[in-house]
Amino acid sequence: MATVQLSRSIRIRKTSKKTVFPSQITNEHESLIMVKKLFATSISCITYLRGLFPESSYGERHLDDLSLKILREDKKCPGSLHIIKWIQGCFDALEKRYLRMAVLTLYTNPKEPEKVTEIYQFKFKYTKEGATMDFDSSNTSFKSGTNSEDIKKASVLLIRKLYMLMQNLGPLPNDVILTMTLHYYNAVTPNDYQPPGFKEGVSSHLLLFEGEPVNLQVGMVSTGFHSMKVKVTTEATRVSDLESSLFQESGTTEIAHQGLDCDEEEEECNTEIQKMNFVCSQQSSERSRKKRKVSEPVKVFIPDRK
């Protein structure tokens, strides 16, 4: 399966008819469409270049000179239907402005889903009546008047970097299992809300990582109405040949709740991932014990990769 993964690559086309993203973003509805497509394209990129589904599970779309593979419903491959259902569940939460973060997690032991081998984080923010939006990882502010061309450039850059990263990562274990957890803005999300295809999940304060983890910042896109930030955590041995300066965070590898990004409106996170087989656990303060709403899929997905 590793051969399949490494043989897949991004192709260059001079012309295209079926484009990925809208040419203009002038209102919140167009912005929502853009973010949905960017999220679905990113998930498709990950599953395709990591060799999780056969070629028949993907259609082809274009982004500038890039020929992209987009996941589609493939009745011959039930696994693709699972992932599409997860994506549609995320769409529902995005439409309602509840979704704070979607986390695609890969692990190998069905009895120990907290022991992960690779994590893909998609963090979302929403403007409030056109207010300025600030990103955690830079001092740049984005307003609702963000130029459509700038949005397109940022989107192309994010997808290019994601493709570059996926093509340079070492192969996954054959027995990998996929799941996706959804995290919410608790202040606005009803306690009984669950997107289609998801159920109430367990909010754990412990994350184990197989091997030595490394955090890779892929990129961010803001439309002025929504923003999406992408981050990957994988084993350091899988990125040995990668130009790490393009992706890696500087300094100590810090992670927040369940090893994920911390949002400024959430409680403080003082969690660290340590090298070699462990761990992150939060301080046992009253604030860090606050229950967070988490959703998990009704059913996890086990690819047939052997």
UniProtKB/Swiss-Prot annotation:
What is its subcellular localisation?
Nucleus; Chromosome
Per the record, its GO cellular-component terms are: chromosome; nucleus
Biological process (GO) annotations held by this record are: meiotic cell cycle; meiotic sister chromatid cohesion
Q: Which post-translational modifications are recorded for this protein? A: Phosphorylated in a SPO11-dependent manner.
Question: What does the UniProt keyword field contain?
Answer: Chromosome, Meiosis, Nucleus, Phosphoprotein
Q: What SUPFAM superfamilies does this protein map onto?
A: The spindle assembly checkpoint protein mad2 (SSF56019)
Phosphoprotein listed as a keyword: yes
Main location as per UniProt? nucleus
Decide whether keyword Transmembrane helix is in the record. no
Signal peptide residues on this chain, from the entry's feature table: none
Assembly and oligomerization:
Interacts with HORMAD1.
Role, per record: Essential for synapsis surveillance during meiotic prophase via the recruitment of ATR activity. Plays a key role in the male mid-pachytene checkpoint and the female meiotic prophase checkpoint: required for efficient build-up of ATR activity on unsynapsed chromosome regions, a process believed to form the basis of meiotic silencing of unsynapsed chromatin (MSUC) and meiotic prophase quality control in both sexes. Required for the DNA double-strand break-independent, BRCA1-dependent activation of ATR on the sex chromosomes that is essential for normal sex body formation.
Tell me what this protein is called: HORMA domain-containing protein 2
